Every structure is written in C-alpha cells, then in structure tokens.
Design a protein with these regions (language model features):
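Mg2+-dependent phosphoryl-transfer enzymes with acidic/Ser/Thr/Gly-rich catalytic loops
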Residues: 29-33, 69-71, 75-77, 84-170
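Alpha-helical substrate-recognition element adjacent to the catalytic core
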Residues: 1-85, 170
Length: 170
C-alpha cells in the first residue's frame, strides 16, 4: 500500500487508539474514558490546517460523541459492526478519494477499513495482526499521544501540511 501524495482526512478508531482501551466504570455504573491532550492538540492543529477527521467506533458510547464535540469532529460513526462501510460513507460524504484517507486502528475489527484507506496506521500496542498490515506504527501506545504522533509523522513525510506556529484552540 503506497501512501498518497497528500492525506486530506484521518479516520480514527476510538478505544485503543484515542484511549488506552481500558473500560472504567464508576460505582453507579457511569462509564469513563481517558483521552490524551497530545491527541486533542494534534486534532486541533490538523483541523485548523484543513484536515478532516472522523471517529469510527465499534462501541456505542455517549462519551465518544462528547469527545467529538469537544474537538470539533462532525463525522462520528458509533456502534459500527462494519468499519469499512463507515469509512466509505465518510469519504463519500466529504467527496474524498479513499486513497487520500488515513485510518488508524488497533484491532482486527479495524482491518477492513485499513485495507480501503490510502494509509493504514496503528499505535505501538495494537494487535499483532494489525501491526503486520499497516504502513505506519507509532512509537506511542493508544491513549498516550499516538494520534498526535501519526499527524506529526505524516507532516514530516510531506503527506499533509500542519501549522505549528500559531495557537490552536481545543
């Protein structure tokens, strides 16, 4: 799979990519997820530079919608049993060629979407079958700034343009 000249969008799995993949519940059954500020800042920088983002999650959690709202991501697909179909929908909705989309996932249920994307990426702690299929493996684990690292790697390779010299709003 050869990377496109320019990545115009990044689609992300949530659990295991933007979070550490753990499930945390409070004493009254409330759910918690921990997101890393490096990822929040990377997404903010990317959005300010014109990069589109989507969240594609197998889980149906209101926390995913809340995170998306916080960082300004409008394309959110939760409860996905077919992440490849969600990726196709995201690309069509935004008039994107799939070759201009990067997908980052961490487990075997992400492989279908990864096969469609122009660039497939995974955090360091992804499942071995995923690590064998991707173009980019970050040194950071999911939930520890892996998305920010991916954005920085793509920018350094000339695959996207990110502005780092002005403050970003998160």
């Amino acid at each position: 799979m050869s990377p496109p000249t320019q990545v115009r969008a990044i689609a992300l799995d949530v659990d295991g990519v933007l979070t550490d993949g753990g499930f945390w519940w409070g004493p009254n059954g409330e759910e918690f997820k921990r997101f890393h500020f490096l990822d929040v800042m990377g997404i903010a920088r990317g959005r300010r530079s014109g990069l589109l983002f989507a969240l594609i999650s197998g889980e149906d959690s209101p926390l995913v919608d809340r995170f998306a709202k916080k960082v300004g991501i409008e394309d959110v697909y939760t409860g996905c049993k077919d992440k490849a179909a969600a990726l196709r929908t995201f690309a069509a909705r935004n008039a994107l060629e799939l070759s201009a989309v990067c997908f980052m996932g961490d487990d075997v249920n992400d492989l279908g979407a990864m096969a469609l994307a122009g660039v497939a990426a995974a955090p360091a702690n992804a499942h071995q079958k995923v690590l064998e299929q991707v173009t980019i493996v970050t040194t950071r684990s999911g939930g520890s700034g892996a998305v920010r690292e991916l954005i920085d790697v793509l920018a350094a390779a000339g695959r996207l343009t990110i502005s780092y010299d002005s403050p970003a709003r998160s």
